[in-house]
Amino acid sequence: MLVTMKEILDRAKKDNYGVTSIMVDRSSLSYEDNIAQTKETVKMCRPLNISVEAELGHVGQSEDYSSDVSDHFTKPEEVKKFVEETGSDCLAVAIGTAHGRYHGTPHIDFDLLKQITDVVDIPLVLHGGSGTGDENLRKAVKNGIQKVNLATELVVAGKE
């Protein structure tokens, strides 16, 4: 059963689920469609006091990860307009990480992260934090990341 975002938010409002935030990933769409759909999600969430995390650039899967993923990186020149037009509360950025287990250590573009940090003042999010390494995580936080997703490590720990 495919449930729409509107149905989820309607249920959350009606049944008082206590939802405080959501993550909307429309990064596989065109830039314009990502803006339009994210903006619509923010519009539905605001009256419910639900914060919205969006993604700009595309954080792929680790099995598809290669050293040449920069085509999907977040573009600093698009960030400010995206945040202003969507009203997103925080932004997941694509700077060299991927979801899932890595074969090796990812190559994070910290210069790109700094450029992104310089153009927006909302919290930035790093997806694909599992297996990134302590030094990379410390450096990411030092350079503007305020939330790190570590789902793979939690799933693995839960299975052990």
Which sequence ranges carry the predicted segments?
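Alpha/beta enzyme core
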Residues: 2-122, 134-145, 150
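Thr-Gly-centered strand-to-loop micro-motif
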Residues: 126-128
